């Protein structure tokens, strides 16, 4: 079976585990005497081979408050690991990423709380997530989670960060706990129609998102609140097609695709001068994408697609139009002859005439008819950046090729 082949590739070996334990030993020595725990997929046994980020949580008494985590706790952690290769990262509050032997370790300060529903910061729930998952999954269940994670990665819907708006690792674990195995998740997902409710516990509030999985450790929270409708639909379609025709392509899609340029494609390459939180940057990028699309449509361009990809430093925005050429003048449709607004229309316009349908018309000059200028004006990044822009002629860039192709390789 395809799943068994995939498991051989993605399931960590004993050698892999020993390598991670060596990395953890270095971290344990540095955090000696602190209240810390290993969390995340490694602790839960659902991690993927060659795709290991270790989460280490350092806990402080809840009465010290969130500000203490951002200053004192963070400084304490940095002082203990400052001779290692580390960088600062930002989520709800700052944390440290340490790189040891090409393994990333996230060291996250958190508050020690009595239960998941008493969480003060988002990460305070994590140990309760770990306990819930480890108490509900056996070894086979952990492999089923691995398959679901790799499937979601392959089709591009894995990751709860704003850039992806997909499924978190915890969400995949809950799906396996609820449905039982990988195949059963796909069978049910192939029939989804939103709103979808998956209740391992009764919700403590009304949720409005398209996919609702109340958190078993904090029923006031929807685990899948961040999952976009686009990713829910993509997962449902992929599930349907995999069940009809299983293929390793769903798990490991072809890296090379080819497609010719259709319409006119504007490429905007953004290089950010400042480091910032990934979610903050991608929140602004997503607003920029929406704003660019709306503005171009308002000015009369026929927009095929606008997408963005990249990291927190280098971002590409691709704009595909039916044509970049648009007239300097356009037909302005006015009111019917009996409307009370005709005087206002006549006063504000030139080149006015009455059409065969009894409606007033005029010719108006567009305020802007250069698509490149419009796109650049509607980028709303709040950090300093440099921009390079060009109209695509041909390319070997695989991300651009995927943008041009649209259809994922697992679908066709």
Curated annotation (Swiss-Prot):
It holds the Pfam family CAA_C. Its EC number is 2.7.7.72. InterPro entries: CAA_C (IPR048833), CCA-adding_arc (IPR008229), CCA_tRNA_nucleotrans_2 (IPR042090), NT_2-5OAS_ClassI-CCAase (IPR006116), NT_sf (IPR043519), NuclTrfase_I-like_C (IPR011068), Polymerase_NTP_transf_dom (IPR002934), tRNA_NucTransf2 (IPR015329). CTP binds at residues 41, 44, 129, 149, 158. ATP binds at residues 41, 44, 129, 149, 158. Keywords: ATP-binding, Magnesium, Metal-binding, Nucleotide-binding, Nucleotidyltransferase, RNA repair, RNA-binding, Transferase, tRNA processing. GO terms for molecular function: ATP binding; CCA tRNA nucleotidyltransferase activity; magnesium ion binding; tRNA binding. It catalyses: a tRNA precursor + 2 CTP + ATP = a tRNA with a 3' CCA end + 3 diphosphate; a tRNA with a 3' CCA end + 2 CTP + ATP = a tRNA with a 3' CCACCA end + 3 diphosphate. Mg(2+) binds at residues 53, 55, 106. One of its GO terms (biological process) is RNA repair. Its cofactor is Mg(2+). The keyword Metal-binding applies. Belongs to the tRNA nucleotidyltransferase/poly(A) polymerase family. Archaeal CCA-adding enzyme subfamily. Catalyzes the addition and repair of the essential 3'-terminal CCA sequence in tRNAs without using a nucleic acid template. Adds these three nucleotides in the order of C, C, and A to the tRNA nucleotide-73, using CTP and ATP as substrates and producing inorganic pyrophosphate. tRNA 3'-terminal CCA addition is required both for tRNA processing and repair. Also involved in tRNA surveillance by mediating tandem CCA addition to generate a CCACCA at the 3' terminus of unstable tRNAs. While stable tRNAs receive only 3'-terminal CCA, unstable tRNAs are marked with CCACCA and rapidly degraded. A single active site specifically recognizes both ATP and CTP and is responsible for their addition. Homodimer. This is CCA-adding enzyme. It comes from Saccharolobus islandicus (strain M.16.4 / Kamchatka #3) (Sulfolobus islandicus). The gene is cca.
């Amino acid at each position: 079976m395809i799943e068994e082949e995939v498991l051989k590739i993605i399931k960590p070996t004993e050698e892999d585990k020993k390598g991670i334990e060596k990395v953890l030993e270095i971290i344990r020595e540095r955090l000696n005497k602190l209240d810390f725990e290993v969390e995340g997929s490694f602790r839960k046994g659902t991690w993927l081979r060659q795709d290991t980020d270790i989460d280490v949580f350092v806990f402080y008494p809840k009465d010290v408050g969130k500000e203490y985590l951002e200053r004192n706790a963070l400084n304490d952690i940095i002082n203990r690991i400052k001779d290692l290769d580390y960088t600062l990262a930002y989520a709800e509050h700052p944390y440290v990423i340490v790189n040891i032997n090409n393994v990333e370790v996230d060291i996250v300060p958190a508050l020690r709380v009595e239960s998941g529903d008493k969480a003060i910061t988002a990460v305070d729930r994590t140990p309760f997530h770990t306990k819930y998952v480890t108490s509900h999954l056996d070894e086979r269940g952990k492999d089923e989670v691995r398959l679901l994670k790799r499937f979601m990665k392959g089709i591009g819907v894995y990751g709860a960060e704003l850039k992806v708006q997909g499924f978190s690792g915890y969400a995949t674990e809950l799906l396996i706990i609820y449905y039982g195995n990988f195949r059963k998740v796909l069978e049910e997902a192939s029939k989804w129609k939103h709103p979808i409710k998956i209740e391992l516990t009764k919700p403590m509030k009304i949720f409005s998102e398209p996919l609702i999985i109340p958190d078993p450790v904090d029923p006031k929270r929807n685990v899948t609140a961040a999952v976009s409708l686009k990713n829910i639909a993509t997962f449902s379609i992929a599930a349907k097609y995999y069940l009809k025709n299983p293929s390793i392509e769903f798990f490991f899609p072809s890296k090379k695709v080819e497609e010719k340029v259709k319409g006119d494609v504007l490429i905007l390459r953004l290089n950010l001068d400042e480091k910032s939180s990934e979610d903050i940057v991608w929140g602004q990028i997503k607003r920029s994408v929406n704003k660019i699309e709306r503005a171009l449509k308002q000015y009369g361009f026929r927009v095929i697609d606008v997408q963005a990809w990249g990291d927190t430093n280098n971002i590409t925005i691709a704009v595909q139009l039916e044509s970049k050429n648009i007239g300097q003048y356009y037909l302005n449709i006015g009111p019917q002859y009996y409307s009370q607004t005709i005087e206002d229309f006549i006063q504000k316009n030139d080149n006015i005439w009455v059409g065969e349908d009894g409606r007033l018309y005029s010719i108006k000059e567009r305020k802007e008819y250069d698509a490149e200028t419009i796109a650049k004006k509607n980028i709303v990044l709040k950090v300093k950046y440099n921009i390079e822009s060009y109209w695509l002629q041909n390319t070997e860039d695989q991300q651009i090729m995927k943008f041009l192709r649209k259809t994922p390789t697992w679908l066709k």
